[in-house]
Design a protein with these regions (language model features):
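Periplasmic/extracellular electron-transfer cofactor-ligation site
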Residues: 29, 103, 109-139, 161-174, ...
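C-terminal capping alpha-helices of c-type cytochrome domains
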Residues: 2-26, 153-154, 181-214, 299-311, ...
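Sequence context surrounding c-type heme c attachment/ligation sites in exported
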Residues: 106-117, 244, 248-259, 269, ...
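Electrostatic cytochrome c docking/interface patches
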Residues: 31-63, 69-112, 127, 208-254, ...
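Short sequence/structural segments immediately N-terminal
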Residues: 2-10, 17-18, 23-36, 74, ...
Length: 375
């Protein structure tokens, strides 16, 4: 009976820590945020509204302090937040008017060649990159699969106003201009909307063909690799090919979405940009992401990649604008690299719990047999 009392006391305090203290500490260190939202227009409306609310609170606090300087600064920040809220609203209202179904890929290619090739390449259609290093701050991306991994409305917003689409207006402004300029709109709304639809059609059409070619080559290479192995059964070969295919696809998406800034040294991947250039450009060196899945967890990364400002307010990391499929691929890649033994670890944990349960039964039985002789 005494042992049961001790057992229940241990269970009580363990449960208190596990379901009480630990979740509370987690909520303090990692405050809850709104869920992942791939409707970027709605997400921006919520974000800018939140920014205005923060600045209004700061203005109230400044008025309470009585400091004229603090009041002036707070009022200026509030007016800026309100102007950005209105400008962001107008941006997404413009994007909402675009009929992407009427885009012409060939005209989009012509527009790209006339406006974008100074910085960007599209190797899938034979357009080489003009800038191949990070001397301007970061290596400009090749846009061969931009139409596959980015949300089409986000891409259009990025073309029209990069700073607002990327949520980096706190970092880049007129005094510190962003590397990518806004697309030169004509002022004719109908023509501008058609041009944007054409550009997106070009990106999506190019990405579709590029992905097909990439998949076919990858599959052929894997089949050739395992065809030489006579020890494996056909079923085992098929399973391994599928596993490596998924990993390579996920890595490919990561490289295009994140690989210009971040290393993953556990997988031998090094960013295409020079870290010192990135530090000067962003204000800090982007972290290696090898173990980020273990330190932050998949749920945190889902929210952070979708909208970095939700987790680290004021961070220089831009919102990437990945669609849901591409974001899942990025997280799966990081999980495979940083937590490759997750399934085995979880399964081993169950076995250990069973082992200790059986051991406890034998320990109690042994204790009773020993003490029964003494009494």
């Amino acid at each position: 009976m005494r042992e049961l009392k001790i057992f229940f006391v241990v269970v009580f305090f363990t449960g208190l820590v596990y379901w009480g203290v630990e979740p509370y500490a987690h909520s303090v260190m990692n405050p809850p945020s709104t869920p992942v939202n791939f409707d970027f227009a709605k997400a921006d409306a919520e974000f800018t509204k939140g920014e205005v609310a923060l600045k209004e609170k700061a203005a109230v606090d400044a008025n309470a302090s009585g400091s004229e300087k603090a009041i002036a600064n707070a009022q200026k920040a509030l007016e800026l937040a309100k102007s950005q809220e209105e400008a962001t609203k107008q941006l997404w209202e413009k994007i909402a008017k675009i009929d992407f179904s009427k885009g012409n890929a060939q005209k989009g290619k012509e527009l790209f060649e006339g406006n974008c090739i100074a910085c960007h390449g599209v190797k899938a259609v034979g357009i080489p990159a003009t800038i191949t290093d990070s001397s301007l701050g970061v290596t400009p991306p090749d846009l061969s699969d931009a139409g596959a991994i980015y949300d089409e409305k986000f891409l259009a917003a990025l073309i029209v106003d990069p700073v607002k689409a990327l949520q980096i207006s706190h970092k880049f402004n007129d005094e510190n201009p962003f590397l990518m300029p806004a697309y030169p709109l004509s002022g004719d709304e109908t023509q501008d909307n058609q041009d944007l639809a054409d550009l997106i059609a070009f990106f999506k059409n190019t990405a579709s063909e590029y992905e097909k070619e990439f998949d076919a080559k990858l599959k052929a290479d894997l089949e050739e690799k395992y065809a030489k192995n006579q020890e494996l059964s056909e079923q085992a070969k098929t399973a391994l090919i599928a596993k490596e295919f998924d990993f390579a696809k996920n890595k490919h998406t990561f490289e295009n979405a994140c690989g210009r800034c971040h290393d993953v040294k556990y997988d031998g991947f090094v960013s295409s940009s020079n870290m010192s250039d990135l530090k000067n450009y962003l204000g800090m060196t982007p972290p290696d992401l090898s173990m980020m899945i273990r330190s932050k967890g998949a749920h945190y990364l889902e929210i952070f990649i979708n909208e970095p400002q939700k987790k680290i307010h004021g961070t220089a990391m831009p919102r990437v604008g990945l669609n849901e499929k591409a974001q899942t691929q990025v997280i799966n890649y990081l999980e495979k690299v940083g937590d490759s033994k997750k399934e085995e670890r979880e399964q081993t944990g169950i076995y250990i719990m069973i082992f200790f349960a059986i051991l406890s039964i034998f320990a109690i039985g042994w204790k009773r047999s020993v003490w029964s002789k003494l009494h």
